[in-house]
Amino acid sequence: MTELKLNPYFGEYGGMYVPQILVPALKQLETAFVEAQQDESFIAEFTDLLKNYAGRPTALTLTRNLSPNPLVKIYLKREDLLHGGAHKTNQVLGQALLAKRMGKKEIIAETGAGQHGVATALACALLGLKCKVYMGAKDIERQSPNVFRMKLMGAEVIPVTSGSSTLKDACNEAMRDWSASYDKAHYLLGTAAGPHPFPTIVREFQRMIGEETKKQILEKEGRLPDAVIACVGGGSNAIGMFADFIDEPSVELIGVEPAGKGIDTPMHGAPLKHGKTGIFFGMKSPLMQNSDGQIEESYSVSAGLDFPSVGPQHAHLNAIGRARYESATDDEALEMFQTLARCEGIIPALESAHALAYAVRMAKEATKETILVVNLSGRGDKDIFTVADILEAKQKQQESGNE
């Protein structure tokens, strides 16, 4: 069997911790990716789809009313304007093209919030691939509009009832299916995590976010931003934003994990700052686990950040101090969801609202002229019913408290 062409590790994190049966499939994927990156016709087709189907480049918008401090400009990288509604579409198109290049006829995917499932379904419809999406039964209930979208575009949505019936269980089932079908199917992983070469592939197919941002901010401001800020679940939108800035020491890289109901409670999803290194989902990375080493449930109001681990490159950037990772609570994200809608007429995804919350916190404390760029990773249409229910429940609670 061929040797690996790329380094599977980021410092001590990453690797390829999978059953032996999957190693040939991962090596085949790595080879196809390396060759595709050097193939002008592949790059041309990917670039064409990004431009003429997905709608790149996306805008870099200076907020008019969001910044609480006259010294601070807050820009939004508008991945919410991408076809499909979120940054997910970028790398899904890249991986679907890779699958076709390898002669695969079928795509297997997992999804939590349904955004990755929708992106996978649209890419499969466009490129004529059969599509199977594994989704936790709980998430199917929480995200019915996205389930319908996937089915409408021809995907088969398979409910997962094992474990906690959420994303980590869907990941396990998708991986199990792929083990039995990798000769004809490609597993289209939805984030910059999992076994090598997925973290590298996903980063490279998302890195145009940061590349465009750099070019756009230089045109608008004549200098680089002081910080780029992105929410972190598995970490694909954040690594897409960070990748082109890693070698720019003047730019601070800030990832925002979900603090849920509070970091001091068990109800959060912040493994980078509060987890222990372990093996999960084919990689070595920080993990939320109990004292017996069992994986603990992560929690976040946003289904897309509800993941008990994190991509290995983020773990490495954190370990070497190149990026710093903060957190925002459910309440802060809900507040920012409403604030951006009222201040700017933009409804952000609950995931992205975590990054916005930290940016506004940072802006309040600034004492000199500062430029912040927030990756607005997706739009909030998928979240309006969730938020409406939460706000209604809060209002009822207040009213009963006032009586």
UniProtKB/Swiss-Prot annotation:
Record's keyword terms, sorted = Amino-acid biosynthesis, Aromatic amino acid biosynthesis, Lyase, Pyridoxal phosphate, Tryptophan biosynthesis
Transmembrane regions listed in the UniProt entry: none
Report the InterPro entries cross-referenced here: Trp_synth_b_CS, Trp_synth_beta, Trp_synth_beta/beta-like, TrpB-like_PALP, TrpB-like_PALP_sf
Q: Which cofactor does it need?
A: pyridoxal 5'-phosphate
Supply the EC number(s): 4.2.1.20
Which of the residues bear the PTM N6-(pyridoxal phosphate)lysine? 88
* Catalytic reactions on record: (1S,2R)-1-C-(indol-3-yl)glycerol 3-phosphate + L-serine = D-glyceraldehyde 3-phosphate + L-tryptophan + H2O
Name any GO cellular component annotation.
Answer: cytoplasm
The pathway that the record names for this protein is: Amino-acid biosynthesis; L-tryptophan biosynthesis; L-tryptophan from chorismate: step 5/5
Q: What does this protein do?
A: The beta subunit is responsible for the synthesis of L-tryptophan from indole and L-serine.
What is said about its interaction partners and assembly? Tetramer of two alpha and two beta chains.
Name it.
Tryptophan synthase beta chain
Gene for this protein?
A: trpB
